[in-house]
Every structure is written in C-alpha cells, then in structure tokens.
From Swiss-Prot:
This is Tyrosine--tRNA ligase. A motif ('KMSKS' region) lies at residues 228-232. ATP binds at K231. PANTHER family: TYROSINE--TRNA LIGASE, MITOCHONDRIAL (PTHR11766:SF0), TYROSYL-TRNA SYNTHETASE (PTHR11766). Homodimer. Catalyzes the attachment of tyrosine to tRNA(Tyr) in a two-step reaction: tyrosine is first activated by ATP to form Tyr-AMP and then transferred to the acceptor end of tRNA(Tyr). It catalyses: tRNA(Tyr) + L-tyrosine + ATP = L-tyrosyl-tRNA(Tyr) + AMP + diphosphate + H(+). GO terms for biological process: tyrosyl-tRNA aminoacylation. It is found in: Cytoplasm.
Length: 418
C-alpha cells in the first residue's frame, strides 16, 4: 500500500497542498521529508507524538525522515495556535531543551534508524539582518502574511514583529533543507498549515513554480466528548518518564473511551488494518474486556518507553488490581503512587486512629473510627477493622513507605521520616 493511502485510511491527513502529486511522487521514488519541533520545553507530550508517528511510518515505508529541532526558531516563538505572545527563553534554556529533545527523539526512532537530526540554529544564526531582508524579506508579501490564520487571529490583540517574522524563518528552513538535502515534503500539525504553505511559496519564488515540494498536516485531535486530546486533570501526559511515569502513561491509554480507542489505534500504533478491524469488532461485541484499550496501551508504551518499562507498568497494574500491594518493589510503589496525596509519618509504631487524623487522611477521630469499623481503611493492601491497631511503619517496603487507602479509590502515600 502506498504510504499516502495508508495515512488516508488511518484518518491521519488533514490538508495537503497537492494530494495527487504527492501520491505520485511517493509511488515513484523514496523521498526525504521533515517535521520540526521547537524546544519550548525539555520534553514532548503525547500531542507532539502524532506527527512523529507519521514520520516513523514514512521511515518504515523506506523514505528518509529528517527531524528538525528549532534551536533558532525556539528562541523566537511560534505564534501558531496562540492568543498571546510567548515569553522569550534564555539561550541557555533553549540549548538545554534542544539537547533534551534530541535525546528523546533518538530514543523514539532508535540509534540505527534512517532518521537524520538537524538544528536550524546551524543556518539561521549565520544570516545577517541585511541578508535576511534582502534575500527573503523582499520575496514575502505582507498582505499574504496578514491573511494567514496564524497572524490574522492575533491582529486584534497584537503580535510582535518578532513573532510576525516566524513564518519567514520556517520558510527559510524548508528552502535550506530542500537545497541541501532534497527534502520535498514538510509535515506538521493542523496549526502549521500557514507556515508550511509560506515555505512552499518561498521555494517556488526562488526556484520556480514547478519545483516539486509539498505540505501535509495532521488533523486536530479531539476526544469524542469534544475536549482536547492529551490533557488530564493532572495536566499533560509527557513522553519523559521523569515527568509522566511509564505506569501513568500506560494507564492513560488503558482508560480511553470506547468511542475513541479505534481512532487512536490507527494514529498511535503500527497495527495493520485487519487487526484493528478485529479490535473494533471486540469493542462492539465485548466492550467489558477492553481488549482494544489494552492493546493500545501496550503498543504506545512499548514504542515510547520500551519493553522493560511496559512490563513494569503491566506488573504494577496487575498488582493494584489484585490488591496485593506488598508485592510491589520500592521503585514500583513510588511510580504507582507518585500522583496521589503524600503525607509524612514518624517511624515509631502508632495507633491507626491517631495516624489517620494526624495526617489529615481523616477529618476527625470519630470519622476515622467509623471508617475503620466499616472496613473502609486498608493499610498496605490489608483491610484494618480494629480501631486499637498499632501500625509499625517499618514493617513493609523497607520501612520507607506505607500505602493507605480510604474507600475504594482514595490512596495516600505515607513517607516514613528518617
């Protein structure tokens, strides 16, 4: 199947500059293409993952992806999709983020992959202001720039000259990569359409209207309930394991709505059409088994964090479901309960009622006794119904933690003071 046909059935294409021309080109030869990311932070989140999954598909089809880290454009700020001006980062911060994102990309694509990393600071930093204005600014029509959504949406609230010129810098990126590496396709999110077409216009003005360059954007990802994909009550789901643990990452995918899961399987996994159709049938016939969600969680967690992290996430999930918390290792306890409320307790044995009230897990001694008597309190996975029980924090988890649950879902991680 042609790569464009595959992306079409996956629903992964939003807009194309020349659909027939690009399909013909990719059918006739292997091409070089690129997608960029600005180092506005030191990690990508799952929203960033979508275009780079597309890049991986091109690689698997034999094409040559280039990943552009915007060391220069990241110091300016992309106005796309924003209502307000970005805060400028220090160059030290930008360089720190460039290194972090480069490492993240290398983990995603693998060290032996046919993917090339580039940094636009290498060429944009060498262009003087006069050269920029003479060589590129002269070719860009202000009226055209003002008409693009990325600028037009900001005219009422205001946009700085710095951010206004961003699309010219991204256009120079496309031109430079086309000249130096024969890159013919740029991929980006739906909000990058204006920047991508600006680059194509610049190339056509310099090299001729028949120059074969293309642009393709991915759809804006919304959940079935209309809310933005990738956000939770706790914030963004990051690709960095230090920001979002593999267990939390795995659980995010496991908890997806039946209405969304098949679309996500198409976007975020490399499963074929037949297998995805089988999982779609399972969602219809046996939704309670959540087979599609399990497969989605497995595939994406393995791709982002690797096999070992996936197995650990599955192990933690299995233990928490069974309630046998004492089988968790210290590291797994920290990973499983990193987002639950934390409390501090002394290392000496303490009466259960006093411990629950002193840590504010229970609002009063009366409520604590009532919950204990009713079996609503578990300590390290064991139900405690004795209000006179003495709890020894040193008994489990090497004396470092105590896991307390009130009711069915309210977990607390008690950290034992040294």
């Amino acid at each position: 199947m042609n790569i464009i046909d595959e992306l079409t059935w996956r629903g992964a294409i939003n807009q194309q500059t020349d659909a027939e021309g690009l399909k013909k080109l990719t059918s006739e030869k292997k091409i070089s293409l690129y997608c960029g990311v600005d180092p506005t932070g030191d990690s990508m989140h799952i929203g960033h993952l979508i275009p780079f999954m597309m890049m991986k598909r091109f690689e698997l089809a034999g094409h040559h992806p280039y990943i552009l880290i915007g060391g220069a454009t990241g110091s300016i700020g992309d106005p796309s999709g924003r209502k307000t001006e970005r805060q400028l980062q220090t160059m030290d911060k930008v360089q720190h983020n460039v290194k972090a994102l480069s490492r993240q990309m290398q983990r995603l694509f693998g060290g032996d992959s046919n993917v090339t990393m580039v940094n636009n600071y290498d060429w944009l930093s060498k262009i003087s202001l006069l050269d920029f204005l003479r060589d590129y600014g002269k070719l860009v029509n202000i009226n055209t720039m003002l008409a693009k959504d990325i600028v037009a949406s900001r005219l009422d609230t205001g946009i700085s000259f710095t951010e206004f010129t961003y699309q010219i810098l991204q256009s120079v990126d496309f031109l430079t990569l086309h000249n130096d590496h024969n890159i013919q396709l740029q991929i980006g999110g739906a909000d990058q359409w204006g920047n991508i077409t600006a680059g194509i216009d610049l190339i056509h003005k310099i090299k001729g209207a028949d120059e074969a360059v293309y642009g393709l954007t991915i759809p804006l990802m919304l959940k079935a309930d209309g809310t933005k994909f990738g956000k939770t009550a706790g914030g963004a789901i990051w690709l960095d394991a230090d920001k979002t643990s593999p267990y939390e990452f795995y659980q995010f995918w496991l908890n997806q709505d039946d209405r969304d899961v098949i679309r996500y399987l198409k976007f975020f996994t490399f499963l074929g059409q037949d297998e995805i159709n089988q999982l779609a049938a399972a969602v219809e016939d046996e939704p309670e088994k959540r087979l599609a969600q399990r497969r989605l969680a497995e595939e994406v967690t393995r791709f982002v964090h690797g096999e070992e992290a996936l197995e650990s996430a599955q192990h933690i999930s299995e233990i928490l479901f069974s309630g046998d918390i004492q089988r968790l290792t210290l590291t797994e306890v920290q990973e499983a309960f990193e987002k639950v409320p934390n409390v501090s307790i002394n290392s000496e044995p303490t009466n259960i009622v006093e411990l629950l009230t002193e840590t504010a897990i229970e609002p009063s001694r009366r409520q604590a006794r009532e919950d204990i008597t009713n079996g609503a309190i578990t300590i390290n996975g064991e139900r405690c119904t004795d209000t006179d029980a003495q709890l020894n924090p040193k008994t489990n988890f090497s004396g470092k933690f105590m896991v307390i649950r009130r009711g069915k879902k309210n977990y607390f991680l008690a950290k034992v003071k040294d």
